[in-house]
Regions:
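Extreme N-terminal leader/targeting segments of oxidoreductases
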Residues: 2-64
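Mobile amphipathic helical/loop "lid" adjacent to a hydrophobic cofactor/ligand pocket
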Residues: 124, 128-225
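Active-site/ligand-binding neighborhood in enzyme catalytic cores
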Residues: 182-279, 286-288
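Glycine-rich FAD pyrophosphate-binding loop
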Residues: 83-103
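N-terminal Rossmann-like FAD-binding beta1-loop-alpha1 element of flavoenzymes
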Residues: 66-88
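Conserved flavin/dinucleotide-binding core of flavoenzymes
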Residues: 30-54, 354-356, 361-362, 367-513
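Mid-domain catalytic core of redox enzymes
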Residues: 60, 273-386, 420
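Glycine-rich active-site loop/strand segments that organize a redox cofactor
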Residues: 100-120, 177-184
């Protein structure tokens, strides 16, 4: 974590920009292989891993039943379901949680990424198992458009959009049209074209709204979003069912923290952070994994390995991938994603949980303690913490490499927030916490769900591919837990039946192959 003091306020920058970081400066590639340029900038080293540099691999020093690579919710869920087995969980960051990571300001939790769950999902059930009570949000999302607060955007708010009657009618028609579509029966068709093909027949105000909503929720604007995603989402957010979303301060980082705490209490010696994986090598009866920790290389082996890592890095670590599968993994696209928490010493905004603001330097913002305000009568807010989501386009990823450009992003967010409504004009945070991730969410481009994911996620003989980009159609907390559980079940079956095909075992645990 790096900390920078800024003239205009306290400005804290944190987060990881590369799935391969950090590598220690002492590493050297195998002779006669391309040299890694090690000049103090760990991003350059990470890119050597990304580009396929081969590092020296020491002999196997220890063996396990299962090695889980990736300490996000997917990897930790796999470890949780493997708790009766001899597992090792490896994570490149010093902390566990991945995109669901909770931070605090004076004991007040706030999210740095993944924000909420839904009732009765596998992740919700896991939270209950861990003794957590996720609280209902019970607040359909409003929007602030042209200075107007529009409550419950896709229900009653459609009559109050600050647009001409013709545009309001178009919003209603769009909602009605998509609610008539069946995202289950027509999944293959709806996944074959972008939602922009439908939106081009509507006024541009609809595209502007979805071009804010899409990047925040699944990393892509309308031209890169399969229609399936919007149809599914509108059935959830624009249908007649009540709001079933649940959360806690810190978002899904609360679940990640509870998982990490539970695992550490039972199996802390099997959890290793700051461990940078450089190779995953299948052998005849096991899989070798080489990683660096505290400047030293280690190779360990297991009967099965679960790759709970994004596909773009998985493809660069696992040896022997079939060409078709490697190509599918490398075809995944990921958005760069800063999340900015602004901490105020007086109330600024507490009208809704998640408010959409199309056309600004941020897409939406969340009231960090919303569910405590609404569900705990004794609760009193100490600081008003607002979490601003500001996903970038892929070409803007380099902006996150420098603190100065991160500061500019934060300043632009504050500028646009102040312009939203007169009440915000003098809003002055006492601190700004900037969390950056280079590749947190895969883009749900057409064909991703029905074609690319099944190909990319096909298990190898002793390697299972977990992570949310093994489920789809978008990245969410429930998919992380589902993929982790499936990975654990698959690994247990593999250990119990070494002769069964990987695909047969995959079908047994519900994998599309």
């Amino acid at each position: 974590m790096t900390t920078s003091r800024r003239d205009f306020l306290k400005f804290v920058v944190a987060g990881s920009m590369s799935a391969g970081c950090p590598l220690p400066h002492s590493l050297r590639p195998v002779p006669d292989e391309p040299s890694a340029q090690i000049d103090g900038d760990h991003f350059a080293i990470c890119h050597e891993v990304r580009d396929g540099t081969v590092f020296e691999k020491p002999p196997v020093s220890k063996r396990y039943d299962v090695i889980v690579i990736g300490g996000g919710v997917s990897g930790m869920a796999a470890a949780h379901f493997l708790r009766d087995h001899n597992f090792l969980l490896l994570e490149k960051e010093p902390h566990f949680g991945g995109n669901a990571y909770r931070e605090e300001y004076q004991d007040q939790g706030y999210a740095t990424g993944s924000a909420f769950d839904e009732k009765d999902t596998e992740s919700y059930q896991l939270a209950k198992e861990l003794g957590m009570t996720l609280l209902p949000i019970d607040c359909w999302d409003p929007s602030i458009i042209r200075g107007e607060f529009v409550e419950d955007t896709w229900h009653s708010g459609l009559d109050h959009l600050p647009y001409p009657i013709s545009v309001r009618s178009a919003f209603k028609k769009f909602r009605t049209t998509l609610l008539e579509m069946d995202p289950e029966k027509d999944a293959a068709h709806l996944d074959s074209f972008p939602i922009s093909d439908i939106l081009k027949s509507y006024p541009p105000e609809l595209t502007q709204w979805w071009d804010a909503y899409g990047p925040s929720n699944w990393g892509a604007k309308t031209q890169d979003t399969a229609a399936l995603c919007v149809v599914e989402d509108l059935h959830f957010n624009g249908g007649e069912e009540p709001d079933v979303r649940v959360t806690l301060p810190g978002g899904n980082g609360a679940l990640a923290g509870a998982l990490a705490k539970s695992l550490a209490a039972m199996h802390g010696e099997r959890m290793l952070g700051d461990a940078t994986i450089v190779s995953v090598d299948p052998q005849k009866t096991e899989v070798n994994v080489t990683y660096f920790h505290e400047r030293e290389a280690h190779t360990v082996a297991a009967k099965a390995v679960i790759m709970a890592t994004p596909k773009f890095i998985t493809a660069r670590l696992v040896a022997g991938l079939p060409d078709e599968q490697s190509s599918a993994m490398r075809a995944f696209r990921y958005c760069p994603y800063p999340v900015v928490n602004m901490i105020f010493d007086k109330p600024v905004y507490n009208k809704a949980y998640d408010t959409w603001c199309p056309g600004n330097a941020f897409t939406d913002f969340i009231v960090a303690d919303w569910v405590l305000q609404k569900n705990d009568k004794a609760y009193k807010q100490k600081n008003n913490i607002l979490t601003f989501y500001a996903p970038l386009s892929e070409r803007e990823r380099p902006l996150l490499l420098q603190d100065e450009s991160c500061q500019t992003i934060a300043e632009n967010i504050l500028r646009d927030f102040r312009k939203l409504q007169p009440a915000f004009r003098d809003a002055e945070p006492i601190e700004v916490h900037f969390y950056r991730r280079g590749h947190p969410m895969y883009l749900p481009v057409p064909g991703n769900f029905t074609k690319r994911i099944p190909t990319a996620s096909r298990p190898m003989d002793r390697i299972f591919f977990a992570n949310t980009d093994s489920i789809g159609p978008v990245s969410d907390i429930s998919a992380a837990v589902v993929s982790g559980r499936r990975g654990a079940e698959w690994s247990i079956r593999r250990m119990g039946n070494s002769s069964a095909s990987a695909e047969r075992l995959a079908s047994a645990v519900g994998i599309r192959v």
